[in-house]
C-alpha cells in the first residue's frame, strides 16, 4: 500500500499496470452480461478483445486523458512476451497509432516506465491524490464510475440505473503487515491486500448487497478538481431537480446537502463495532476505523 511514514517508505515508485477499465475492470464477472460482444480482461492489454477494439480504445484515451485526474493519469501499453506477437500485433499497433495522435496534439507524453518513475519521484515525495473516471460508457449501459485514491484511502463512486453508490472503499495503513513478511507462502496462490471497509468484488452475494447507496434517483454527475488542494468534487444532479456534492480529499469524503446514505457490507466484512463516531473494523487481526466527523 502507499506509505504514510518515512520508516516504511521505499524510494521506488510503484505504478498500476495494464490500463484498467474504470467501469468493467472491477467486478468484471458480475458485469459480463452487460457487454456480450467482448471477452477477456477489461484492460488495455492488446491481446484481449478490449485492447484491440478501436471504439473501446478511443474511449479509453478520452476517459483517461480528458477527465480530471489531479496528480495526472497514466496507462501502460504492451504485453508480456509469452503472449506472442501474433496475438498482440493488431491491438498494439492500434494503441501506438492512438498514442501518436494524442501526443502530436499535445495531450499526453509517451515515455518508458523508467522515465515516468524518475519524473514522478522528482515531483512527489508522497503518493499524491489521484483520480480516474469514466463519464461515458463504451457499452451503452449508461454507467458512470469515479475512482479516487491517495496515500490514506481509495474509493469508487458508481452510478448505475439511476442509483449512486460506493462499491469500493479501502483504508491504507503501512503498519498492516503482509502475510509473507516472516512466513513464506507455500500455497499455489498468494494474497496481497489492504484494509477493506467496503469490498463489493469479494463480499456481494445473491442474498446480500454490498454497497453504500444514496437515496433517490440520480440523472447525472460531473467532476471538478482543485489540483493545489488535492481535492475532487462530484456534483450530483438528481431526478427531482436537486443538486448536491461529494468532495474527496486525503482526509476522506464529505457530502453537502446529500440524501440519506444506506450502508450494506455484504457477507464477511461487517464492522466489529458501531459507535457514535463511526465504524470499527478488524482484518487479519489488525484493527482500524472509519470516523464520522459530522452527521449521524
Residue ranges of model-derived segments:
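Aromatic- and carboxylate-enriched substrate-binding clefts and catalytic-loop regions
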Residues: 1-16, 77-82, 105-131
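Substrate-binding cleft of secreted/luminal carbohydrate-active enzymes
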Residues: 54-120
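Surface beta-strand/loop "capping" patches
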Residues: 120-159
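Broad, structure-driven detector of short, well-ordered beta-strand segments within folded domains
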Residues: 152-159, 242-250, 290
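Beta-strand-rich recognition/accessory modules
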Residues: 45-62, 73-80, 266-296
Amino acid at each position: 500500500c502507499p506509505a504514510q511514514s518515512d520508516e516504511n517508505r521505499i524510494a521506488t515508485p510503484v505504478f498500476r499496470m495494464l490500463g484498467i477499465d474504470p467501469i468493467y475492470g472491477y467486478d468484471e464477472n458480475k458485469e459480463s452480461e452487460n457487454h456480450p460482444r467482448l471477452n477477456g480482461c477489461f484492460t488495455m492489454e492488446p491481446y484481449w478483445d478490449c485492447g484491440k477494439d478501436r471504439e473501446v480504445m478511443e474511449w479509453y484515451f478520452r476517459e483517461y486523458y480528458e477527465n480530471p485526474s489531479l496528480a495526472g493519469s497514466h496507462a501502460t501499453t504492451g504485453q508480456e512476451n509469452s503472449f506472442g506477437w501474433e496475438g498482440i500485433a493488431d491491438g498494439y499497433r492500434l494503441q501506438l497509432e492512438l498514442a501518436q495522435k494524442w501526443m502530436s496534439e499535445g495531450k499526453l507524453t509517451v515515455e518508458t516506465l523508467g522515465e515516468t518513475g524518475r519524473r514522478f519521484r522528482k515531483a512527489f515525495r508522497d503518493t499524491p491524490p489521484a483520480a480516474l473516471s469514466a463519464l461515458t460508457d463504451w457499452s451503452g449501459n449508461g454507467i458512470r464510475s469515479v475512482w479516487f485514491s491517495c496515500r490514506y484511502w481509495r474509493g469508487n463512486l458508481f452510478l448505475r440505473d439511476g442509483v449512486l453508490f460506493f462499491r469500493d472503499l479501502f483504508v491504507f495503513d503501512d503498519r498492516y503487515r503482509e502475510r509473507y513478511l516472516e512466513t513464506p507462502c507455500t500455497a499455489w496462490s498468494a494474497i496481497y491486500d489492504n484494509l477493506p471497509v467496503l469490498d463489493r468484488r469479494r463480499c456481494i452475494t445473491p442474498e446480500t448487497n454490498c454497497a453504500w447507496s444514496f437515496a433517490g434517483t440520480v440523472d447525472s454527475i460531473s467532476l471538478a478538481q482543485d489540483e493545489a488542494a488535492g481535492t475532487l468534487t462530484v456534483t450530483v444532479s438528481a431526478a427531482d431537480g436537486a443538486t448536491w456534492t461529494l468532495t474527496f480529499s486525503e482526509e476522506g469524503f464529505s457530502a453537502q446537502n446529500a440524501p440519506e446514505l444506506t450502508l450494506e457490507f455484504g457477507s464477511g466484512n461487517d464492522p466489529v463495532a458501531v459507535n457514535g463516531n463511526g465504524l470499527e473494523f478488524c482484518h487479519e487481526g489488525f484493527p482500524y476505523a472509519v470516523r464520522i466527523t459530522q452527521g449521524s
